[in-house]
Amino acid sequence: MAEKVNVCIVGSGNWGSAIAKIVGANAAALPEFEERVTMFVYEEMIDGKKLTEIINETHENVKYLKGHKLPTNVVAVPDLVEAAKNADILIFVVPHQFIPNFCKQLLGKIKPNAIAISLIKGFDKAEGGGIDLISHIITRHLKIPCAVLMGANLANEVAEGNFCETTIGCTDKKYGKVLRDLFQANHFRVVVVEDADAVEVCGALKNIVACGAGFVDGLKLGDNTKAAVIRLGLMEMIRFVDVFYPGSKLSTFFESCGVADLITTCYGGRNRRVSEAFVTSGKTIEDLEKEMLNGQKLQGPPTAEEVNYMLKNKGLEDKFPLFTAIHKICTNQLKPKDLIDCIRNHPEHMQTL
């Protein structure tokens, strides 16, 4: 790595802007980092003015993180290659569907000894069906190592400076320290583990469970039912990792990326909120995304679809009744009120005494 570590944030949505507050402050304060942090911003017009100009002049992302000032050393750049070309650390924080295209644009245009870290909670569709981990796509396309950061980190609360924890999954110990230094703050405590695949899978699967929690809220079934859905969701997450990513540690599920992220997403996240409105309003998920998320996309429904493809291929849908039911509700194959019937006889309840 260079004497001073250059950092680029690829993405500037709600979460990207919140993390820019921490990364920018650390880059300015710590001697190992270059002070200037570039942030790739998809250019759009806001009231007749370019979003990058607004961010660089006012140090506020008025579209995705209104009311929060970004550090002055975070510089918005509308050209992806220009933002990333000098980076030693690339922080990817964009909707997962953009990653293959971004990697194509960056191939051969970044430092060969750079490292990446993905903050993206979702899977991509693998060729031939199934799922591909975002960190694997980044490594495969860009030929650089890619760690992951996942946790109970609702963007607005992180931006407010409220205390929380996060988990970095990094298979190569030599990168663990520099990544922890870049993200650790008084209010944002980082634990580094080597079990990177499990950390990343947790970050995606919990969005499916959060949709289930939202359906329960929309149906007004109460806290006991919601707790049951969360617990069964955790058990299905553990089982899914066991089947498709064997060798992971059970302890990883008790880090912030696991049970903590699951709880916070099932009570406060956008997947829960939109899923509740899906039940109460009768509108489509697409319409609710436009209405409630400023055009941003939910991760839960597409992740449920990708996971269902994998379960179907292995004949395992009946072993994952919660994931299966949530997918079917999101695709209008089942009514939300059918959710509980689907999990009444969950494998978790079929113990032999």
UniProtKB/Swiss-Prot annotation:
InterPro entries: 6-PGluconate_DH-like_C_sf, 6PGD_dom2, G3P_DH_NAD-dep, G3P_DH_NAD-dep_C, G3P_DH_NAD-dep_euk, G3P_DH_NAD-dep_N, NAD(P)-bd_dom_sf. Pfam families: NAD_Gly3P_dh_C (PF07479), NAD_Gly3P_dh_N (PF01210). GO terms for biological process: carbohydrate metabolic process; glycerol-3-phosphate catabolic process; glycerophospholipid metabolic process. One of its GO terms (cellular component) is cytosol. It is an enzyme of class 1 (oxidoreductase). GO terms for molecular function: glycerol-3-phosphate dehydrogenase (NAD+) activity; NAD binding; protein homodimerization activity. NAD(+) binds at G11, S12, G13, N14, W15, G16, F98, K121, A155, R270, Q299. Pathway: Phospholipid metabolism; alpha-glycerophosphate cycle. Keywords: Cytoplasm, NAD, Oxidoreductase. It comes from the Eukaryota. Homodimer. NCBIfam families: glycerol3P_DH. This is Glycerol-3-phosphate dehydrogenase [NAD(+)], cytoplasmic. It comes from Drosophila virilis (Fruit fly).
